[in-house]
UniProtKB/Swiss-Prot annotation:
This is 4-hydroxy-tetrahydrodipicolinate reductase. It comes from the Bacteria. InterPro entries: DapB_C, DapB_N, DapB_N_CS, DHDPR_bac, NAD(P)-bd_dom_sf. It is found in: Cytoplasm. One of its GO terms (molecular function) is NAD binding. It comes from Campylobacter jejuni (strain RM1221). Its main location: cytoplasm. The keyword Signal does not apply. The lineage of its organism: Bacteria, Pseudomonadati, Campylobacterota, Epsilonproteobacteria, Campylobacterales. Pathway: Amino-acid biosynthesis; L-lysine biosynthesis via DAP pathway; (S)-tetrahydrodipicolinate from L-aspartate: step 4/4. (S)-2,3,4,5-tetrahydrodipicolinate binds at H132, G141, T142. Catalyzes the conversion of 4-hydroxy-tetrahydrodipicolinate (HTPA) to tetrahydrodipicolinate.
C-alpha cells in the first residue's frame, strides 16, 4: 500500500481526499498535515505527498522537500512565478506533478480547446469559469491554464491579449483578444467553458464538475502513478499520455 500524506488536510480538498482514500485499495493515509504541524513527520511517514494548501504553504513545502525529497502532487492554485521556479528547481531531485485541476475531463477539455484554437483561427475566443462563493482567487487556475493553451496554439502571448472584464464604451473587440471571465455564487464546484465565435456559427466546449470527489480521485490516481516515476516535472498530459 502506498502511503499518502495530505498537506492542507483541513481544507475542502484535503477533507475530500481523506474521505476518498478510505475506500482506496492501492493507497492509504499516512498523515494529515495542516499549518503548524510537523513537516519532518509528514515526509518520514509518506511515500508521496498531495498538496492542496495555499501559495505560502506550497512555498514552505517545496523548501523543506529539498532536505528530504519525496514525490509531490501539487494542486494549489494562485502560485506566482517565484514558487513555480522553485518547483521546477526542486523537480531536479524528486518527481513533482503540478496541475491547476486534477480532473481528467478538464485535461481533455484543455487538449480539445488547444486543437480548436489552432483549427479555428478566425474565431473569437471567450472563456468563462464559474465557482462557489467561497473561492478566493479569480480567475481560476484552470481558466488561466485554458487561456494559456489557446493563446499558445495561436502563437500569442497571453499577457498581451487577455481581457478580464469589459465596461463602458470600450470600442470593438480586437482580433486576438482572449477574454477570461469569472462568476461566483452558491455551491458551484466548478464549470469551465471555452467558446469559439464566428459570424454565423459558434462552438462552445464545456466541462462541469458536480463533486469535489472528481478532483480528489484524480489526485489519488496521479499520486499512485507519480510514486513510481523518476525526478522531473510532470503535467496532466504526461499522466494521460497525450
Amino acid at each position: 500500500m502506498i502511503k499518502i500524506g495530505i498537506y492542507g488536510a483541513k481544507g475542502r480538498m484535503g477533507k475530500q481526499i481523506e474521505e476518498c482514500l478510505k475506500s482506496e485499495t492501492q493507497a492509504q493515509i499516512s498523515i494529515l498535515y495542516d499549518k503548524g504541524g510537523n513537516l519532518g513527520e509528514l515526509f518520514e511517514k509518506s511515500d508521496v505527498i498531495i498538496d492542496f494548501s495555499s501559495p505560502s504553504g506550497t512555498h514552505e513545502l517545496l523548501n523543506y522537500a529539498r532536505t528530504m525529497p519525496k514525490p509531490l502532487v501539487i494542486g494549489t492554485t494562485g502560485l506566482d512565478e517565484k514558487i513555480l521556479h522553485l518547483m521546477q528547481s526542486a523537480s531536479e531531485v524528486m518527481p513533482i506533478f503540478y496541475a491547476t485541476n486534477m480532473s481528467l475531463g478538464v485535461a481533455v477539455l484543455n487538449y480539445l480547446a488547444s486543437k480548436a484554437s489552432q483549427m479555428l483561427r478566425n474565431f473569437d475566443i471567450e472563456i468563462l469559469e464559474m465557482h462557489h462563493r467561497h473561492k478566493k482567487d479569480a480567475p481560476s487556475g484552470t481558466a488561466m491554464t485554458l487561456a494559456q493553451s489557446v493563446a499558445k496554439a495561436r502563437n500569442l502571448e497571453l499577457e498581451k491579449v487577455r481581457v478580464s472584464g469589459r465596461d463602458g464604451i470600450i470600442g470593438e473587440r480586437s482580433k486576438d483578444e482572449i477574454a477570461v471571465m469569472s462568476l461566483r455564487g452558491g455551491d458551484i464546484v466548478g464549470r469551465h467553458m471555452v467558446g469559439f465565435y464566428e459570424d454565423g456559427e459558434f462552438l462552445e466546449l464545456n466541462h462541469t464538475a458536480t463533486s469535489r470527489a472528481t478532483f480528489a480521485k484524480g489526485a489519488i490516481k496521479i499520486a499512485i502513478w507519480l510514486s513510481k516515476q523518476e525526478a522531473k516535472m510532470y503535467s496532466i498530459n504526461d499522466f494521460l499520455g497525450i
